[in-house]
């Protein structure tokens, strides 16, 4: 938002003004600016972020990753395709749910040759189908954690991802897929620091970007 010489920057994890940015430049650790560039994906954050987002208008500032999924096709397609790699089903934002937007699990809704009297009737039929679908927040921690990582990874304004045990709650095949997704997603301008005890996470990373992987073994001294 532009207010003359003062500008407002709002989004997921940050709400800053141009004066704040100047002030944080003198902070050794950059204050709240860190949240614009660094994503911290511990277990709690991953599970919480998969809960439904508050409903907003299409033009409002996006304050939750699900808002990007709901209102921008590229994010919707990306997260659905990567979720399907692990679980065989797609993710669909339910924007007609009411006061929040959950992520539904199932097939994309397509009406073939059915005729509707108007657009409102078609949307009501679409809504009725999604009401029968499972929702991410009601599933086990494996699906919620996997979805939470995807919701962070798709936001390309982050430069650094701190990911604590991404294999948590996942079976080995899904952990391998997660390693591959992380390796495939990060651009040359991004990096991830991953704490893991999983061979499958490491194997997945090595399968897609071996030249970028550095493995550091930490041994606790008694």
PLM region spans:
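FAD-dinucleotide binding site
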Residues: 9-10
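Extended helical coiled-coil dimerization/tether regions that scaffold
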Residues: 21-160
